[in-house]
């Protein structure tokens, strides 16, 4: 069976970071995720999805992702229940995030630069460090040569085309 969730959305407010009695970090947050279709009056609706993230990724999220941040989240969906103060059973469905990734720079979000930026923060939960080697000049191998650069017409008939 598969229980896999991938979301891209904006944080509706700053994450709420707490610690369990055994000092395990847990952060809760809500993502506003646009639907792919528009309503009858032409407006795009959004779903507000409750999420929870644990341990070091929770601390990273609380430190780096603020209200309005565009983030990508991977994880699983879970339903839990508890009894409230009135004795009623309450069911909660939420996404348990394994990791997240910032999808835009702070400058872009705040209206500064409009250039392309990959976010620069990939919160991979693996324990290995990922350091990149210094950039090296790669050989061109003729990539700048256009195969259509000589502008000679091609001798091909319509019968030779597969479509």
Swiss-Prot record:
Record region (Disordered): 109-163
This protein's GO CC annotations: nucleoid
TM region(s), chain numbering: none
InterPro entries recorded: NA-bd_OB-fold (IPR012340), Primosome_PriB/ssb (IPR000424), ssDNA-bd (IPR011344)
CDD domains xref list: SSB_OBF
Classification via Gene3D superfamilies: Nucleic acid-binding proteins (2.40.50.140)
Pfam family name, one: SSB
GO MF term list: single-stranded DNA binding
Boundaries of every SSB domain copy: 1-104
Complexes and interactors: Homotetramer.
Functional summary from the UniProt entry: Plays an important role in DNA replication, recombination and repair. Binds to ssDNA and to an array of partner proteins to recruit them to their sites of action during DNA metabolism.
Name by which UniProt lists this protein: Single-stranded DNA-binding protein
Species: Streptococcus pyogenes serotype M1
């Amino acid at each position: 069976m598969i229980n896999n969730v991938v979301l891209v959305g904006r944080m509706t407010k700053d994450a709420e970071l707490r610690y369990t009695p055994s000092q395990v970090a847990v952060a809760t947050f809500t993502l506003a995720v646009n639907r792919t279709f528009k309503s009858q009056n032409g407006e795009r609706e959004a779903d507000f999805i409750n999420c929870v993230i644990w341990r070091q990724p929770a601390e990273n999220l609380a430190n780096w992702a603020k209200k309005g941040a565009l983030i990508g989240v991977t994880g699983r969906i879970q339903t839990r229940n508890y009894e409230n103060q009135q004795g009623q059973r309450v069911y909660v469905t939420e996404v348990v995030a394994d990791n997240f990734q910032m999808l835009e720079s702070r400058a872009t979000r705040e209206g500064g630069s409009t250039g392309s930026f990959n976010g620069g923060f990939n919160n991979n939960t693996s324990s290995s460090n990922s350091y990149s080697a210094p950039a090296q000049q790669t050989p061109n191998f003729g990539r700048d040569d256009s195969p259509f650069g000589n502008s000679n017409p091609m001798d091909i008939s319509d019968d030779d085309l597969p479509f």
